[in-house]
UniProtKB/Swiss-Prot annotation:
NCBIfam families: S21p (TIGR00030). It holds the Pfam family Ribosomal_S21. This is Small ribosomal subunit protein bS21. Residues 43-58 have a biased composition (Basic residues).
Length: 58
């Protein structure tokens, strides 16, 4: 879980910006999108295989 302690004399905007940066580094948005809908194991394997194929040829 990402958390940010607001420092003294720090604006809310800069604290929010730091929080968003921490969330992006932790990969929270990608994880939420990935878990939004159930994905069958066969579909997961297919996506994993396609990603490996893309990495190999690019």
């Amino acid at each position: 879980m990402s958390s940010v302690i607001v420092k003294e004399n720090e604006t809310l905007d800069s604290a929010l910006r730091r929080f968003k940066r921490n969330c992006a580094k932790a990969g929270i948005q990608q994880e939420i999108r990935k878990r939004e809908h159930y994905e069958k194991p066969s579909v997961k394997r297919k996506k994993k295989s396609e990603a490996a194929r893309k990495r190999k040829y690019n």
